Design a protein with these regions (language model features):
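A short, aliphatic-rich beta-strand micro-motif
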Residues: 1-5
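Amphipathic alpha-helical "output/dimerization" segments
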Residues: 6, 23-44
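Short beta-strand-to-loop transition segments that serve as allosteric relay/switch motifs
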Residues: 7, 12-23
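Short catalytic/binding micro-motifs of nucleotide second-messenger systems
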Residues: 80, 123-128, 160-171
Length: 171
């Protein structure tokens, strides 16, 4: 077998077995080593692409979809809802008096609030739903295949969870 390395760090291995007892030739082994290096390089570039994609499509602070990606995905979901004849519901959240939080408690605390609210939103919707940071302290949730009647308890639960959260922050 040969290791698969990314920057001299083992990330996997390739192991080959033969049914017959004939050993692999030196040329076979060299080819396998070369393949392991190519595979390691491919894994490295795939990880780099994933980082670039994440940076391009997600808000850096909240790790939610960014505004542009939200608009693109929203259009896709509208078309999907029309095609499959199902509902989508959009819920918009705005943090009241957020400027006052930044002005009185500082921007690090404001960042903590944004990150905490982002986590609350993600934890209170399904994996198929979309959550986005729409603007400074504005968030949008798209509930897929969900009527307004069924979305209301979700929105109320999120508002209640945010309102009751202690927001303890140690700088």
């Amino acid at each position: 077998g040969v290791p698969i390395k990314v920057h001299n760090e083992d990330v996997g291995s390739i192991i080959l077995e033969r049914i017959n007892p004939i050993p692999f030739s030196a040329e076979n082994q060299d080819s396998l080593i070369f393949f392991g290096k190519i595979l390691g390089s491919a894994i490295f570039w795939l990880k780099e692409y994933d980082k670039l994609y994440q940076d391009a499509t997600h808000d850096g602070l909240s790790q939610l979809l960014n505004h542009q990606t939200f608009k693109e995905r929203f259009q896709e979901e509208i078309l999907r809802a029309e095609r499959f004849q199902h509902f989508i519901t959009v819920i918009m959240f705005d943090l009241d008096k957020f400027k006052r939080i930044n002005d009185t408690l500082g921007h690090p605390y404001g960042d903590y609030v944004i990150q905490t609210v982002s986590n609350i939103l993600k934890e209170n919707v399904r994996a198929i739903d979309l959550v986005s940071r729409y603007g400074g302290e504005e968030f949008v949730v798209i509930l897929i295949n969900t009527s307004a009647e069924n979305a209301r308890p979700v929105g109320e639960r999120i508002v209640k969870t945010i309102a009751e959260y202690p927001f303890d922050y140690d700088s």
